[in-house]
Amino acid sequence: MREMYPKKGRVILHVDMNCFFASVEIAHDSSLQGKPLAVAGNEKERKGIIITCSYEAREYGIRTTMPLWEAKRLCPQLIVRRPNFTLYREASFQMFQILSRFTEKIQPVSIDEGYLDITDCYALGSPLEIAKMIQQALLTELQLPCSIGIAPNLFLAKTASDMKKPLGITVLRKRDIPEMIWPLPVGAMHGIGEKTAEKLNDIHIQTIEQLAKGNEHIIRAKIGKHGVDLQRRAKGMDDREVDPSQMGQHKSVGNSMTFSKDMDEEKELLDMLQRLSKSVSKRLQKRTLVSYNIQIMIKYHDRRTVTRSKQLKNAIWEERDIFQAASRLWKQHWDGDSVRLLGVTATEIEWKTESVKQLDLFSFEEDAKEEPLLAVIDQINDKYGMPLLQRGSQLLRKQEKSFQQKLESKFM
């Protein structure tokens, strides 16, 4: 199959999952197959917007970022699911695991897309055959559809994957650029947003062809060096390489909660922080992962966002340790103002088998005693789907909260 690969240059695939969140929901619940489905915010709140929707929903004119009330007007029978980011992250993890069977040269771009450099993968088949194998594996094993672009560089591969959806495979060569890409408006080009398109329009650049053939000095003067990079890509030139080191950056496990109303009660916020820590812990343990860095995110009522992280000497994975790190960050950085969103994320992830928790003399005996107990508590709670068993510290905090509420209701 070596003859199917270029003697010089590279072969890049861009794998882009189709309607990812909606597709994951359908894979999780087959009764949604073939029906208009949207993943969106709370139906009861008019502020809810469409995060993504199925192709059946798009036939009614429903689009991403559309207000939910408008989507329901266009399609009264629209099925709405609240976003389940735990489910989506798990599906993303499985997706990249499948991609890693074909090559180690993988660069995640987001939760649902990534680049693969298959230049040296000729033993597996032609580029088109490899793309078909990837597409079939994702569809068979995860019930998730994707589109794949095949090209000599990252920009063209990304452009190609957008051309046929769903379940498309598109080959885009440099010689195809004048016919397939140049006639398009500059706003349709990957990497050009609305504001950049407006600036290019100001200097009479309307199409990608005009960008490719435009005066470099005028373009640079208008939008800087980024404009020159865009011009090179419009000509089909892109020297960026697939960066496998970003695969590690993709490995983060996090959960966040947006509150229906602003919260400023510290005990309630700490209780939520512990629930988020527990969720992160369970997902780490499910994947046999550990973390060396814990991060919290606080979004205030006025949309101010604070993100802080703590580097850890030892790898952690248990709820107790994650919550301890998160709560310390919280106490250091919460300014007392009311909060709309709270998040906990474990980063700098490694496989647990590759990492050893370095226990000091005082923590070793305590951890050794508690690990079997924590495992039993988690198993029983998971089996019955509810927190039947809890640690004493959790119960004590709940009792304090209940007692406080009774006092408030009696004397206020």
Swiss-Prot record:
The record marks 21 as: Substrate discrimination. Residues 235-257 are annotated as: Disordered. Monomer. Signal peptide: none annotated. HAMAP family: DNApol_IV (MF_01113). One of its GO terms (molecular function) is magnesium ion binding. It catalyses: DNA(n) + a 2'-deoxyribonucleoside 5'-triphosphate = DNA(n+1) + diphosphate. Belongs to the DNA polymerase type-Y family. Its main location: cytoplasm. This is DNA polymerase IV.
